[in-house]
Every structure is written in C-alpha cells, then in structure tokens.
Amino acid sequence: MGARCLALLLLYGTLLLLLLLPQLPLAGAATRYYTFNVKLQNVTRLCNTRAIPTVNGKFPGPKIVTREGDRVVVKVVNNIKDNITIHWHGVRQMRTGWSDGPAYVTQCPIQTGQSYVYNFTINGQRGTLFWHAHVSWLRSTLYGPIIILPKAGLPLPFTEPHKDVPIIFGEWFNADPEAIVAQALQTGGGPNVSDAYTINGLPGPLYNCSSKDTFRLKVQPGKMYLLRLINAALNDELFFSVANHTLTVVDVDASYVKPFDTDVVLITPGQTTNVLLRAKPTAEAAGATHLMMARPYATGRPGTYDNTTVAAVLEYAPPGHIKSLPLLRPSLPALNDTAFAAGFAAKLRSLACPDYPSNVPRRVDKPFFFAVGLGTTPCPGSNNQTCQGPTNTTKFTASINNVSFDMPTTALLQAHYTGQSAGVYTADFPASPLEPFNYTGTPPNNTNVSNGTRVVVLPYNASVEVVLQDTSILGAESHPLHLHGFDFFVVGQGTGNYDPSKHPAEFNLVDPVQRNTVGVPAGGWVAIRFFADNPGVWFMHCHLEVHTTWGLKMAWVVNDGPLPEQKLMPPPSDLPMC
C-alpha cells in the first residue's frame, strides 16, 4: 500500500511538473522582476504641460531587458483614476494568457489602488518587442521597449553591434487623448489628430518650441549600431530614414530576417524593426549634421492623420558645432507611396535555416477570409444633430466581415475557462463575408455594419490560414492587423481582390517572414498562416487605435489539447475582478 501511494505521489508530481514547465525558466535562464507604478507625471512638450499617465514617472516608460528562455515577472500598481492593463506586445504567452493584458479579453482591468502581477516566459523569440497599456487610448503615453537578447552563448546571425539603441515612435497630444476619443464616440466623427510625432518621447527641431526637446544619437565613427525601431504611435504608419546612411534590416517583430539594405524603413503601429547602421569614417562624418526623420505613410482621407514630420539628430563624436555644419535631411517617400510599401514588404524573408527554421503550415485545416474596413452605423434618432460621421445621420464604425466587435463587461478568457460563456460571447463569427461584394471596387449601397461579441473557436494545433482583404467601403486604406498569442507567417500579398483560384499558387511557403503585426495593403490583401498551438483567448485587431475603437477587432478561442502541457494554466490568485 505504501509503495502504491509513493508511486501515485511520484506520478502526481511528474504531472504537476509538466503543467508548470512553461512557467519554469530553462536551465541557465533567469527570472527578472520589475515593478511598474502607474502614476501621473507633469510632462511638457510643444510648450504645453500636461499631467500624463506614466510608468514610474518616465516617458517613455522603462525598458525590460531579458533573454530568450527567461521568466519575466512584473507587478503593475495602478495609482491613476483610470482602470489599466498592460499588454506585452508580441510575447507569445504560451499557456499564460492571463498575462497577455487586453482589457476584457484576457483580464478585467486593474482598478485604482489595486495591483496585478504579470508572469510569463520568453519562448523562441529574440529581438525587440514592446509593452503598452491596453485600455482605451491610454497607450498614447504608457509604452516602453522589451529587449530580448539571445540565450547566453548564442551568437547573433549578423554583425555584432558596438551598441544597440531603442528608437520609439509615438504621438503627442496637447489635449487629453481620453477626452478626444470620448468626444469622437459621442459625435460619431473622426477624432482630432495628434499635435506631433515623437522619437523617444521628444518632438525634435521641426516643431515649434521643441528644439531643446530633440533626441540625439551620439555615435563613434566607423562603429556599428543596432537601432531597435518601435512604432508605438496610436494611429499612424511611418516612414523612417537617416540622412546619408544605409540601414540593414535584420529582425522584425522579434524574428530574424534575411538581411537587406534600404534607405527607408516602413513601420506600422505595433511593429518593430531592428536595423544596423554603420557610422561613417571620421573624414566623412565630421562635415555635416545628419537628421533621422519619420513622417506618416497615409492611405486614408486627408485630415485623418497627423501630416507632420519628426526629427532627431545623429551626432558624431566629438560633436561639431551644429550651426556651422550643413544640415542633411533624408529623402522620404510620398505620403501615399503604396508601391514603396508593397516593395518593402516583399523584401522581408525569414532566415529559414537549420538554426532558425521556418515552420510554416503547408496544409490548412481552417481557412478564413476576413474583409476589413470602415463602415457606418445609424445615429440615435434623438441625436441626429450631433452626428459628424460620413453623413449627418451616420457614425463612423469599423468591422471584420461586417461584424463590429462589442467589448464585453466580463473577460472573455475567464468566461471560456469557467465554461460560462453564455451571455458573454457567441461562437459564430463568420469565416467569410455573409454577403460577398467587389471589395476594392464600387462600395455597396448599404454601408451599415452589424454588432456583436462573436468569436471563432479553434481546436488545439489546427493549421489556420487567414486572408485579410481591405475594402473600399469608405475608401481603401491600409490596416495593420495584430494577432495576440501567436507569430504568423505572411505567405502572400497583392493588390485588388484576392482570387482563391489563382493566388494560393503564388504563396511563399519556403521562407515567409514571421511576425505578429502585418499591414493589410490599401486596396489589396495579405495572407497569413499559423498553428493554433496556444490554448486561450486571443485578440486580433487593427493597431490603428481609432479603428479598434470603432470595432475592427475579433477574438480566437483556442481549446486545450489532450496533454497536460497543451492546456491553459489556471488563473493566478490576484487576477482582477470586473
């Protein structure tokens, strides 16, 4: 009897260990602890001072530095009046969906005076990601970099840099962004655009009252630098370039790519791009001041984006006297240069080598066709006079397959885990538009959308293909779509309407780029594939915050697999309540 009990105890211990494996750091890995105190801080930009939400009083927020395989533990304490969550953008969160962060999807928000501990392990990723708030528009100031170094002893698959530098793009609003979005939702119109772009929180010399608020990157002649580009802007894709310097792209969304040279990088909100920059020899460098500049790639209608340019300075050591040196500005593409956007995306290829294989699904279990774009919804009958949407009787909205997603008041993951989804969500999100139309042609007469909290349920480890098709209902426009909980492979893209009888034969199943956020081309389509190997509930949404606000979002429910290590971990004891 005693031997039998011991055997059962050992079996129980083995099963428990298997359950905990994703939470345990690998041998030689570390556990890295952080505390994020969310609090208001007075910050002045453009000669305008505003009390903004920050982490630990810093803007941008502190960086997290970790290695592949490490566990990261972050205690977030909310000291502001708004509810808060933090999303670890791009982190796979294998079986740890409770730490993903989107409000009312994987957790209820952290209320004022409360705290929550995010606990996750970095699995199979190295490069640059970032963290940001995931409630309303609070991420306009609550963001910071996540630096993922390779496992100790593993070399980089490109030239070792002398130094690496985060370059975070953001948007500055003189007004409170929460008031801006509240007004837009009340009127049904588009929100006011930002007053400036920022690089590492600073607007730079091209804006009024901002020459002293300029980021300066000091470099040594001849040295190699790794720039970790992060687009944390709310609503704008950006072109970026450094005057008189070539950039070598080596990593996107914490996945290595085949290196290629470019003068300009296109980066959408939610994307990261690591580029190498070799500083020029002394004789060349001393003769000029080099600007680093970014401005929007804008395919929407005029007035819907901030049409300004942000600049920083690349400064050689020893620095020259700026007033006496010629000022070199980079050449940036036209605002709506869709050809450059398509060409840049086509250059991105994964390494697809033995050390970093490209495990793209070659067969598809679950195909989906998602038509994405803007639409309308009628104004309330008694408030027609306040409507400022496409017409005076409609409001702007956005949808996937004509479903504008309604956020629940209970976290979807909690409802799924407890088996109490009734009244929270329905598992009937359409796999394709119920009423197909010429997506990039003449818009249909009826532009109204439906509403609902509808999800797709996937069996564990299903191979999934999603074709994301832009629509011209209210004008063709690029949409950066972000998928939580997974990296996906971008197997194809094109202009016009997707043709299922023609385009799959052109898919790249050898070395497609792997990422977590992809730009759906304006007036075109993009195809992605991934394995549903991460149980939980995973948000998918446009990373233009205004479009997410209007409903361009949905959720995937991935069921548990049969084995212990294929099941969602239990919720932590401090999970916030709604």
Swiss-Prot record:
Residues the entry annotates as binding Cu cation 2: H89, H132, H543
Binding residue positions for Cu cation 4: H479, C542, H547
Claim: Ribosomal protein is one of the keywords in the record: no
Binding site for Cu cation 1: H87, H482
GO biological process: lignin catabolic process
Subcellular localization: Secreted, Extracellular space, Apoplast
Cofactor note (record): Binds 4 Cu cations per monomer.
UniProt-listed SUPFAM superfamilies: Cupredoxins
Example GO molecular function: hydroquinone:oxygen oxidoreductase activity
Entry's family note: Belongs to the multicopper oxidase family.
Biological role: Lignin degradation and detoxification of lignin-derived products.
Protein name: Laccase-10
Originating species: Oryza sativa subsp. japonica (Rice)
Gene assigned in the entry: LAC10
